[in-house]
Amino acid sequence: MPLAPELHPDIALSLPLLLNIRLWAKARKPPNAGRSNSERGKPGRSPGLTFRELRAYQAGDEVRHIDWRVTARLGRPFTRLYSEELDQAHWLLLDLSPAMYFGSTRQLKARLGCELAAALIWQGEKQHNTLICHGLISHHQSQRGSVLPLLESLCHHYQQGLARRALSHSLADTLSGVKLPHGAKLTIITDHRPCESAICQQLQLLSRRHDIHYWQIRDPLEAALPSDGQLPVAIDRPGQHYQGWLDGGHAGFSRRYQQAAEQQLTHGKQQLLPLVQRLYLLDNGQTLQQQWQEGLCHQG
């Protein structure tokens, strides 16, 4: 008896898998980290100083941090103490729309996205993580101590998305509803296709106050055709129905296909690099652990 699709090992996403990711995701620096598969965009926001407390002056305190108004009022020196914003709040937006439930080789892009989300959550376990799943129902959940509830949410919302039902709201709609706290960093995990203008507008607004790291997932079939065989394709939209073949054995067609794919990727980079601090590209034909440990996901 054949397995149900959601139970197939290349499709299923289990909580033990996400728990095991911590074994390699929390390493300080992946081996060979110089091969980072990312590009720098606009300059990042420098961590600011947050006022922590006011106390009586002590030897060694910075003179420039003396509060002269309080000192004059009380007749003895008082110092304002500050702490640097090292522990940024981290908001993670994961796209689980139907387009992410595609994969031509070893996995669905949505599953790789969930694994990446889990790795980033484990990496920043001591930060305040907030997870937003863009799917049938946009889900928003903040970390309260353990990261386990966030990992359980990833499994649950991934499972819901396997139905591939059309969404009533766009990724731009979900972005427009994100209210980030001061100094928070936003990580977005989504498809590799060029952004709609509405998404670019939302990114532009958010980037004024927040650092944005943008992860794109690209399937091997979205980069080039296999050299042998034909792949059936069908387009079925209102007022548009088409059936045909992608012929990887035809050298001219295969070359034009690859050129179009590269042009699309380049166009997406040109859109995003002025709007985000870091732009990453993940290969859906490789495991996340392989890309992480080879340094392709290094964020340094």
Model-derived features with residue positions:
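A short, compositionally biased
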Residues: 130-132, 151-152, 226-229
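DG-centered beta-turn motif at the end of beta-strands
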Residues: 68, 95-96, 182-202, 212-217
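Von Willebrand factor type A / integrin I
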Residues: 1-33, 37, 42-43, 180-182, ...
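Von Willebrand factor
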Residues: 146-184, 197, 219
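An amphipathic, basic-hydrophobic helix/alpha-beta surface used to engage anionic
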Residues: 1-145, 185-189, 222
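Amphipathic coiled-coil/heptad-repeat helices and related helical stalk/stem segments
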Residues: 50, 117, 171-172, 198-199, ...
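Residue-level marker of alpha-helix boundaries and capping positions
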Residues: 111, 193, 258-259
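Short, flexible loop segments at the rims of nucleotide/cofactor-binding pockets, characterized by
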Residues: 69, 161-167, 190-192
